[in-house]
């Protein structure tokens, strides 16, 4: 039986987000998910469920985000100052981090 950690080649984290290929971003996201034991790096709840408690506390204005922003449930969060990845987060947490905390 294959586990998530055996399905991708480990990468040296963090990675530079803007210069990483889609496949490197995917590998990094998968590695973060594994290292975070399936929990969101922001809200610490399982990445398999929508973080409704945060959405209720911080309503998301979807018009602020590009089309397709919410097409993928798990995002690779990165620092906009250093361009280095931080961890895997819910797409909603990524939106909240940007909209409310300029991350």
Label for each model-derived stretch:
Residues 22-26, 90, 101-103:
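General structural signal for secondary-structure boundaries
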């Amino acid at each position: 039986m294959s586990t998530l950690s055996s399905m991708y080649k480990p990468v040296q984290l963090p990675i530079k987000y803007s210069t990483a290929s889609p496949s490197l971003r995917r590998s990094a996201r998968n590695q973060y998910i594994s290292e975070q034991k399936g929990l969101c790096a922001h809200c610490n709840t399982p990445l398999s469920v929508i973080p409704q408690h945060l959405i209720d506390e911080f309503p998301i204005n979807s018009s602020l985000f590009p089309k397709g922003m919410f097409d993928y449930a798990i995002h690779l969060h990165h620092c906009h100052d250093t361009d280095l990845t931080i961890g895997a987060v819910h797409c909603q947490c990524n939106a909240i981090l940007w909209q409310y905390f300029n991350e």
